[in-house]
């Protein structure tokens, strides 16, 4: 919040017409039921698996390998959209790592978001998913469907239901409005009311827009 306030010179604040956030993907943020990141909960700021996992976090490679082998054996259709791969830097392997290594943290997850989605959520208060992230590095689709139940439950029992819940939200495309800037933020930053905030984008997609 403070960074954005400092980035926009005061003389330009009244001319801001819209906001869009992009971030390197997939940077995973886990949320509790009250909308806070798990790392914001009391006593969890230093818990490794509650903290943001940056896009280049690669400790979940074993999970990625197992998921890819199973997806190939089952001929899961989503591989046609991912170039036939599942990276350890994506949502699914990272979530499996938390599930296996920190069940007490995993049990507190309500939602899992890519950073561009999380920041947009914080700006607007609206739970909006970016189709760019969801359909690629979360292995989902625009209609919020995910790989076959057999595939996800083949990785861990009950994982299909968990994964679908973690990625709930209103799916929108780049350029579509996710909501308007929250009133308390317009006051804090000295910006006009009702500024539209676009759906979050992946940084690589932004460079092509």
Predicted regions and their residues:
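Glycine-rich phosphate-binding/catalytic subdomain of phosphoryl-transfer
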Residues: 2-209
């Amino acid at each position: 919040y403070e960074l954005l306030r400092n980035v926009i010179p005061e003389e330009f604040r009244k001319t801001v017409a819209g906001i869009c956030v992009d971030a390197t993907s997939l940077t995973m943020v886990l949320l509790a039921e009250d909308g806070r990141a798990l790392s914001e909960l009391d006593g969890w700021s230093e818990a490794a698996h509650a903290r943001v996992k940056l896009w280049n976090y690669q400790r979940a490679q074993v999970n990625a390998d197992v998921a890819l082998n199973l997806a190939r054996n089952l001929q899961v259709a989503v591989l046609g959209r991912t170039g036939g791969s599942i990276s350890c830097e994506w949502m699914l392997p990272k979530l499996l790592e938390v599930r296996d290594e920190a069940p007490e943290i995993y049990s507190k997850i309500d939602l899992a978001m890519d950073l561009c989605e999380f920041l947009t959520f914080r700006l607007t208060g609206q739970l909006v998913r970016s189709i760019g992230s969801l359909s690629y590095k979360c292995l989902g689709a625009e209609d919020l469907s995910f790989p076959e139940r057999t595939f996800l439950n083949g990785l861990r029992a009950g994982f299909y239901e968990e994964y679908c819940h973690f990625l709930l939200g209103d799916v929108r495309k780049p350029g579509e409005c996710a909501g308007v800037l929250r009133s308390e933020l317009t006051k804090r930053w000295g910006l006009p009311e009702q500024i539209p905030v676009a759906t979050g984008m992946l940084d690589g997609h932004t460079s092509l827009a």
